[in-house]
A protein has these predicted regions:
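Carbohydrate-binding surfaces in secreted/extracellular proteins
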Residues: 1-2, 92, 190-224
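Ligand-recognition surfaces built from glycine- and aromatic
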Residues: 226-258
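Residue-level detector of short, conserved catalytic/binding motifs and their immediate flanks
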Residues: 88-90, 112, 134, 199-201, ...
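Boundary/junction segments of secreted and surface-exposed precursor proteins
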Residues: 1-4, 237
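Secretory/extracellular carbohydrate-interaction modules
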Residues: 55-173
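Extracellular glycan-recognition surfaces and repeat-rich motifs
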Residues: 3-58, 63-64
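Solvent-exposed loop and beta-edge segments used for protein-protein assembly and interaction
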Residues: 51-53, 83-88, 106-108, 193-197, ...
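Trp-centered recognition loops
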Residues: 85-88, 93, 174-202
């Protein structure tokens, strides 16, 4: 309900060439609005906002620049000066907004991302070759060849998107029967995808088991520690948003996550 921006670290990454004149514009092509009144977009109070406040953190990416400098990018938010280990979890109410009807419109596919065991010093998103910790991602309208992502960084800092079998994940596309059941139509505009609705999201580490939970259903679970890859099992949590594509949404103001 209040502006807590001073308590967060914000980092961004882009696939633009660092030597390109448009690099700085691409790297800064995001917005993070703390204490945003999302009722102005017709969104009801989040189910876990005890005081029924309609304020939250709104994030958008790759929507500010209409020039050829528009590039795929991601942005991460980390709580400042926080470190966790052992059994812990990050839980949020998430609303992914997208332009267009069921299945989305022009440039609608963007992913909300969330993770743990991060250093808070590196950006985690799909096109970043290095990073740390673990994180997951989901789009709002099933518009990608991979709607549900799982990422992991090894002890050398190399980031890999994990296939569902290694991630312990149900599947990667919104057409999977479990996602179709979890996010049914017409309650959800795009069946199998969580967009344009409040969805509870939890990423937890419990007795060396890493789990991703949405609306109470475990959709990914695997050992938190991985001796082969040397995955981190302590650190801070991360919330974020990423656009895997250079295209701009139209209308661009409809694409964001709260």
């Amino acid at each position: 309900n209040t502006d807590t921006s001073a308590n967060w670290i914000v980092l961004s990454g882009t696939n633009a060439d660092e030597n390109d004149d448009a690099y700085d514009a691409a790297l800064g092509d995001f917005t993070v609005d703390f204490a945003f009144d999302y009722s102005t977009r017709g969104i009801p109070p989040a189910p876990n906002s005890g005081d029924k406040s309609t304020r939250g953190v709104r994030i958008s990416v790759n929507n500010n620049d209409d020039t050829t400098g528009s590039e795929a990018m991601g942005v991460n938010l980390f709580p400042a000066k926080q470190n966790f280990s052992g059994n812990y979890a990050v839980r949020v109410d998430m609303w992914i907004n997208y332009n267009g009807p069921a299945g989305g419109g022009t440039g609608s596919t963007e992913h909300a991302i969330f993770g743990m065991n991060q250093s808070g010093e590196q950006v985690g998103w799909s096109s970043q070759p290095t990073g740390d910790g673990v994180w997951f991602g989901v789009d709002g309208e099933g518009g990608s060849s991979t709607d549900y992502y799982s990422f992991e960084a090894d002890d050398s800092g190399t980031v890999s998107p994990l296939p569902p079998d290694l991630a312990g994940m149900v599947g990667k596309n919104n057409t999977h029967p479990v996602y179709q059941f979890l996010f049914p139509s017409p309650a959800f505009e795009t069946q199998g995808a969580p967009g344009k609705n409040w969805v509870s999201v939890e990423v937890r580490q419990d007795d060396d088991v890493l789990s991703w939970v949405m609306n109470g259903m475990v959709i990914a679970s695997r050992p938190a520690s991985d001796e082969f890859f040397g995955v981190r099992t302590e650190g801070t949590v991360m919330l974020g948003y990423m656009d895997l594509f250079n295209s701009i949404a139209n209308p661009k103001e409809d694409n964001f996550v709260v």
